[in-house]
């Protein structure tokens, strides 16, 4: 089995979340493999920018997820362990990167995003992240 460390972002603009539709018609969160000793924070920020055109800022860590799949190109099982960061976008502006195989991107209200997101694990992560985001934003407003 091939083990890969990855990093990604759960990006909010106000009360909306950023998700993408990939080449397999799956609605996912932006993420990528950590290579050459890069920091997970940097990889997460770079993948968000590269995949969606959004210049987000990290406001907190969210946790980790892990999933396994069989890679047809590698002909072996792969385990991706992903470190997730809660991020805030400066504006509701994005840019679809079709060169990476993405078909759609956008900021969606929580209910719509949860309906669209393909994987249960990602839906749980988004729900948890939304709660944490609201708590952090309320703390900042009161400060």
Please give the residue ranges for each predicted region.
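N-terminal strand-loop-strand
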Residues: 1-29
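Conserved hydrophobic/aromatic beta-strand scaffold that supports enzyme active sites
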Residues: 10, 19, 84-86, 107
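Short aromatic/basic micro-patch
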Residues: 28, 79, 107
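The catalytic Nudix box helix
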Residues: 29-64
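NUDIX/MutT-family hydrolases
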Residues: 84, 95-127
């Amino acid at each position: 089995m091939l083990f890969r460390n990855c990093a990604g972002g759960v990006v909010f603009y106000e009360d909306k979340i950023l998700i993408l539709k990939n080449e397999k018609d799956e609605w996912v969160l932006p993420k990528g493999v950590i290579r050459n000793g890069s920091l997970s924070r940097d990889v997460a920020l770079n993948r968000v920018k590269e995949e969606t055109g959004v210049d987000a800022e990290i406001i907190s860590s969210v946790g980790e997820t892990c999933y396994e799949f069989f890679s047809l190109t590698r002909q072996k099982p792969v385990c991706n362990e992903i470190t997730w960061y809660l991020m805030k976008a400066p504006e509701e502006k994005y840019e679809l990167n079709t060169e990476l195989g993405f078909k759609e991107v956008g900021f969606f209200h929580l209910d719509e995003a949860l309906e669209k997101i393909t994987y249960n694990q990602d839906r749980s992560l988004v729900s948890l992240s939304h709660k944490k985001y609201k708590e952090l934003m309320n703390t900042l407003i009161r400060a």
